[in-house]
């Protein structure tokens, strides 16, 4: 894909096409329906569809509609996965903003390493906060997740098991209280009772 602000528009179209694909995988989407879903004029949607088709992401047949190619399916799925992971992440931290809109902005900044890291620290979620299925990771991401899999939530510690704290997701005030009690990054802890 291209770089910069225009790439975000392409990403959004690919993500929306994947969303249509989730609902009806074999259906061609009319440009008018895509334009409506994207909140743009039909001419703008047609222009972007032609652009993405020329890059091999969409199969476009004038007056018949558009659908994802195999390459487009991979790309759209990746964008939707990153969006939904961002929503799960934003739901798990002290955040009062609009989760969906913020996730729309964050998804473009998530690369493979960050996607794998989010997968690990969020416990490989399968649903986003609204109950939508998070698409499965591709093989490259699964391999990275396997490399990073040394992180586990504290709640998974067995009785008598020790671990080192690697990250803490809490408001600064609560985090400070924990740190004053000795629970801080790199501290070794042991689960004594349930």
Describe each model-derived feature in a short phrase.
Residues 64-83:
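Basic, amphipathic "hinge/linker" alpha-helix immediately C-terminal to the N-terminal HTH DNA-binding motif
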Residues 49-50:
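Short, hydrophobic-biased segments on the C-terminal half of alpha helices
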Residues 43:
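Key DNA-contact positions within bacterial/archaeal DNA-binding proteins
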């Amino acid at each position: 894909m291209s770089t910069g602000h225009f790439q975000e528009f392409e990403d959004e179209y690919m993500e929306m096409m994947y969303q249509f694909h989730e609902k009806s995988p074999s259906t061609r989407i009319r440009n008018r329906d895509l334009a409506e879903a994207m909140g743009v004029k039909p001419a703008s949607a047609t222009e972007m569809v032609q652009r993405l088709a020329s890059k091999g992401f969409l199969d476009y047949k004038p007056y018949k509609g558009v659908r994802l190619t195999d390459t487009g399916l991979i790309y759209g799925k990746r964008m939707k996965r990153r969006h939904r992971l961002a929503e799960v992440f934003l739901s798990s931290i002290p955040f009062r903003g609009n989760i969906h809109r913020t996730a729309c902005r964050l998804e473009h900044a998530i690369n493979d390493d960050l996607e794998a890291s989010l997968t690990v620290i969020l416990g490989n979620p399968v649903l986003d906060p609204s109950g939508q299925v998070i698409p499965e990771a591709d093989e490259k991401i699964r391999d990275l997740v396997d490399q990073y899999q040394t992180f586990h939530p504290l709640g998974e510690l067995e009785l008598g098991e020790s671990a080192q704290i690697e990250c803490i997701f809490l408001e600064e005030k609560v985090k400070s209280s924990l740190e004053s009690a000795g629970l801080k990054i790199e501290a070794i802890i042991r689960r004594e009772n349930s």
